[in-house]
A protein has these predicted regions:
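Solvent-exposed, non-transmembrane regions of membrane-associated and secreted proteins
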Residues: 3-246
């Protein structure tokens, strides 16, 4: 009987994910959800004071109404001020919930936590690289996640395609990124967190499955920002064909 259970467990890990650690992560995600919801409410009020009256809608993009492009500079300034304040409070608090990441391509919607400590952070969900930035600061934000254990949020990271959108919902704003390319790098290659001169999102996970020898990395560029209380998203990246995957 024990042998059968072991085979079943191994099969679940190979074809799905580790069920034991996934239960733990599901519990942590549930516990963090109400805490994060309260944080969103608090920052919504702060953002309303920051941005003032909502912008009028003008035109559509991808089915979503967007505000005039001329407003992007002021929205980015507001986002930066809010992000700086948020970072000053949350940076370095290992395991604390920061926001949510949504990737429709792989059916992902999960809470992101601070830092990439194995037990203190990544056991709860994807974690923000502490040496990286925060969305809205105009630099590179990195998020790492497991592929086989602890709910395996990035198990299907290699299914994400160039041109896909990645939405990061922070208490101070919603940031939509457009995927530019992907790379497979050595596990110790930190060039993925280089400065690029624009607001970039980097996702990484161990590669191949069941190995930590390399990392599969997704690079995406900020496309639009929606501050809490604002009526619409504001496009900050001119429409152009996505960069061919490398």
């Amino acid at each position: 009987m024990a042998g059968v259970l072991l085979v079943v467990y191994a099969a679940m890990v190979v074809f799905w994910r580790d069920p034991v650690t996934s239960i733990y992560t599901a519990y942590e995600q549930h516990e963090m959800s109400s805490q994060l919801d309260k944080t969103f409410v608090t920052w919504r009020e702060d953002a309303r004071k920051e941005i003032g009256a909502p912008l009028p809608p003008v035109g559509t993009h991808g089915g979503a109404t967007v505000a005039p492009a001329v407003s992007s500079a002021s929205v980015l300034r507001s986002a930066r001020r809010l992000a700086l304040r948020f970072a000053s409070i949350e940076h370095g608090h290992t395991g604390r919930p920061l926001g949510r990441i949504r990737i429709s391509r792989i059916g992902l919607s999960t809470i992101v936590v601070e830092n990439t400590d194995y037990w203190g952070s990544l056991s709860k969900g994807p974690g923000r690289y502490e040496q990286g930035s925060f969305p809205g600061l105009g630099r590179t934000t990195g998020i790492a996640g497991h592929r086989t254990t602890f709910a395996a949020p990035f198990r299907h990271i290699d299914s994400i395609r160039t041109g896909d959108s990645i939405v990061v919902e922070m208490p101070y704003g919603t940031f939509t990124y457009r995927v530019l390319r992907h790379r497979i790098v050595d596990n110790g290659d930190w060039s993925i967190m280089r400065k690029v001169g624009f607001d970039e999102l980097v996702l990484s996970a161990c590669h191949p499955l069941y190995s930590a020898s390399h990392r599969y990395v997704i690079f995406a560029r900020l496309e639009s920002v929606k501050l809490p209380g604002a009526r619409d998203a504001v496009r900050v990246l001119p429409a152009s064909p996505a960069t061919t995957a490398a």
